[in-house]
Every structure is written in structure tokens, then in C-alpha cells.
Design a protein with these regions (language model features):
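Acyl-CoA/ACP chain-elongation machinery
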Residues: 181-227, 260-274, 304-311, 328-378
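ACP-dependent fatty acid/polyketide chain-elongation machinery
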Residues: 1-66, 244-256, 351-365, 409-412
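Phosphate/pyrophosphate-binding loops at sites that engage ATP/ADP/AMP, CoA/4′-phosphopantetheine
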Residues: 84-96, 245-250, 283-299, 321-325
Length: 412
């Protein structure tokens, strides 16, 4: 019999708060974490707002050298991992360091470092570029630094799959547990891409909302007036453990990761396949692996990016897989509050799925004021809803046609 995979700890840093509790409470209240960009002057950019991590002071958590050298996405990962380990009652000093693997997802990596070092190169010449830049912009530096900071010596790697990166990281961690290769995996995702290069590039692409006059209403998944996604940043780390490890440590799991499905569209680098074949298949694979019927899913945390193409395509995917149940299952897009955390989004939304299960509450989709006729399901648009949630499903559909779907189950 294959080992089962349980979540025993969660750590979160994001636009809604500096920890899991504050993030969940803000989500329940329908709070928008989106506002005018403060980390650089956005004047002149087509999009001037984002879902930033507010009041983040790395010196509250890290030493002076780490504050000075580490890219923001690595700092987020370390802080969120610390909360997750504490939540799981895992002390790195007292456990076998080789027993813990690390798999983290990020869509871009150290793009903030890239932007800053490019400015130095342009303004002060090649001798002023940091010799550490080549290290701290790499996607794999985040799991490496988590390993070093906490002394964890199991295998570590980064998953880079655009918007599905951290969902795929959880999926690979799930497979490590199920195969018996590891009993404990620190997994999730981190992203800090709100910098001039990324904001200008995505803006020129036409992917970002330009609702500069009212940023808090800009992320409006499934709304007829949606005009693009809103960039967000942050990290979410989950501690995944085998049933054997959970039993031997005597801890109470939060939820079970029961299924994972992944496919590729093989269609277009930015547009989803309108036929929904591959995205639907990913959902079906996750549901099948969880050994459940589609009708048993109580809540879907939608990818819901607030882009014209994604939202109507995802609605079609849900209808295709769930049939009549699509009209009854609760759906929401928490990106309406956080913006799109890119490579960290899948893990962030997985953490919110687990909170939904623990609290039997569906977080809302805010800003859905003008329903799109092509998006006609229950998106929880009038506030958080209390209802029994035994099984939650999270969709992540990334640029490049990466589809990753996770199924979580209650353990009570």
C-alpha cells in the first residue's frame, strides 16, 4: 500500500498578511491587498499597481548579510518556511537532516536582483555589478538557501513552470511521499517579481490590468469588465509528511494531499487552449488519483486570473469535468484579493484550500460586479460562505500551457 501524504504545517507571506492567520482572516473579510506600487516609482508605466507584501522588513527575520545579499524571493521563502516548520512542530536541530527534502516552485526567480543589477550596469559600469548576482537570480537559489538556513540535507530542487510552478512542486513532493523516497518534504513556492523589468514587460504584452484609477478593484475574475491580471508577490510553504512520519511524531495533520494531475496544452505560450482538452484532463487525473467522484468536490479554488481568455476557458473546463455538479460546487478566485503570485500562486492557493477545509468556509471572489455571460457559475461573489468542505480542488494553469491540479481532503 502506498504511503499517504499529509500537510502538517503552513507558512505564508503575501499581500494579505505576514503569516497564515492574518492572510486567512483578510481573505475571509474580502480584503484587497492590491495598491499602487511602492517598491519603485511606477510613474510612466502602463500599470502602476500590484499586490505587494507590505511592511516587510527582512531584518526582523534574517541577519544583516542575508538582508543585503538575498533576493526578496529567497527572503520570503525562508520566512514562510520558518512559520511552516514551527506550525508542524519540526525542529531542524532535533531531526535527521537527511530525512527532509525541499521542493520549491518559482516562475521567474531573482528578477528583482536582475532589475537592480541591470540598473547598476547601465548607470555605473560593469565593475559595479555584484559578483553574487549570478547566484541570487537563479530559481534554485531559494531551496538552496532554505536548506542552508535550516540545516536540511535531503534532496532539494526548484520547479520552474510559470504560473503552475508551485502547484507542480507540491505535486512532485506528493510523488516523493507516495513512492517512499521521502517522509518529509518542505514544499511550496515563492515569487517577488514586482520590479520595473517585469511590470513593463507584462504591461507591453497586454497581460496586465490598467485600472490605475482604482487598483483595489482591478483584479476581477469572471467579471465582464476584467482587463488583465494583477501582479502579486509572496510565498507559501507547506510541510508534507507521510502517514508513517505523522504517526511516529504524534502530530495531527491539517489535511491530506490526495491527488495531483498535470498536463500540457501544446497550443500557445500565453493563450489557453479553447478546446479545454488538456486542462480538463489534468482535473480528471487529480480527481481519479484521489479516488473520488467529481460530485464529491465541495470547493474549487479557481486559477481565476482576471484575464479575458483564462476565466471563460476555466469555466468551460469546470463544466466539462463536473457536468451538472458545476452548478452546485462552490468556486472562488482568491487572486481577486492577492493578485497573481505567478510561480507562488499554486502553493498560496493550496494553503487557502486547506484553511477552507479546516474552517468549512469558502473565501470570496471580490470585485465581481458585472457577471460575464460566459462565466455563469457560483463564484462566491457576495462574501465568504460557511458550508461543509470535505474535498477542495485547486487549479493552476500557467503560461506555456502548463496545467497542474491538486486535490485536498479533510482528515476529520
Amino acid at each position: 500500500m502506498q504511503p499517504r501524504a499529509f500537510i502538517t504545517g503552513i507558512g505564508m507571506v503575501g499581500p494579505l498578511g505576514m503569516n497564515t492567520t492574518s492572510t486567512w482572516n483578510a481573505a475571509l473579510a474580502g480584503t484587497s491587498g492590491v495598491d499602487r506600487i511602492t517598491t519603485f516609482d511606477p510613474e510612466g508605466f502602463s500599470t502602476q499597481f500590484a499586490g505587494e507584501v507590505k511592511d516587510f522588513d527582512a531584518s526582523d527575520y534574517l541577519d544583516k548579510k542575508q538582508v543585503r545579499r538575498l533576493d526578496r524571493f529567497s527572503q520570503f521563502a525562508i520566512v514562510a518556511t520558518g512559520e511552516a516548520l514551527n506550525h508542524a512542530r519540526l525542529d531542524p536541530k532535533t531531526i535527521d537532516p537527511f530525512s527532509v527534502a525541499i521542493i520549491l516552485g518559482t516562475g521567474i526567480g531573482g528578477t528583482d536582483s536582475a532589475s537592480k543589477q541591470h540598473n547598476l550596469l547601465a548607470s555605473r559600469g560593469p565593475l559595479k555589478v555584484s559578483p553574487l548576482y549570478g547566484l541570487h537570480m537563479l530559481p534554485d537559489i531559494a531551496p538552496s538557501l532554505v536548506s542552508i538556513h535550516f540545516g536540511l540535507k535531503g534532496p532539494s530542487c526548484a520547479v520552474v513552470n510559470a504560473c503552475s510552478s508551485s502547484a507542480d512542486a507540491l505535486g512532485q513532493a506528493f510523488r516523493m511521499i507516495r513512492s517512499g523516497d521521502s517522509d518529509i518534504v518542505v514544499t511550496g513556492g515563492t515569487e517577488a517579481a514586482i520590479c520595473p523589468l517585469s511590470v513593463s514587460s507584462f504591461g507591453i504584452m497586454g497581460a496586465l490590468s490598467q485600472r490605475n484609477d482604482d487598483p483595489k478593484t482591478a483584479s476581477r475574475p469572471f467579471d465582464r469588465l476584467r482587463d488583465g491580471f494583477v501582479m502579486g508577490e509572496g510565498a507559501a510553504i507547506l510541510i508534507l509528511e507521510s502517514d508513517r512520519s505523522v504517526k511516529s511524531r504524534g502530530v495531527e495533520p491539517l489535511a491530506e494531499l490526495a491527488g495531483y494531475g498535470a498536463t500540457s496544452d501544446a497550443y500557445h505560450v500565453t493563450a489557453p487552449d479553447p478546446n479545454c482538452t488538456s486542462a480538463s484532463r489534468a482535473v480528471e487525473l487529480a480527481v481519479k488519483q484521489a479516488n473520488i467522484e467529481p460530485e464529491e468536490v465541495d470547493y474549487i479554488n479557481a486559477h481565476g486570473t482576471s484575464t479575458p481568455l483564462n476565466d471563460k476557458t476555466e469555466t468551460a473546463v469546470i463544466k466539462k469535468v463536473f457536468g451538472d455538479h458545476a452548478r452546485h460546487v462552490a468556486i472562488s478566485s482568491t487572486k481577486s484579493m492577492t493578485g497573481h503570485l505567478l510561480g507562488a500562486a499554486g502553493a498560496f492557493e493550496a494553503a487557502l484550500c486547506i484553511q477552507a477545509i479546516l474552517n468549512d468556509t469558502v473565501p470570496p471572489t471580490i470585485n465581481l460586479a458585472n457577471p460575464d455571460p460566459e462565466c455563469d457559475l457560483d463564484y462566491t461573489s457576495d462574501g465568504a460562505k460557511h458550508r461543509p468542505i470535505n474535498i477542495a480542488l485547486s487549479n493552476s494553469f500557467g503560461f506555456g500551457g502548463h496545467n497542474a491540479v491538486l486535490v485536498f481532503r479533510s482528515v476529520t
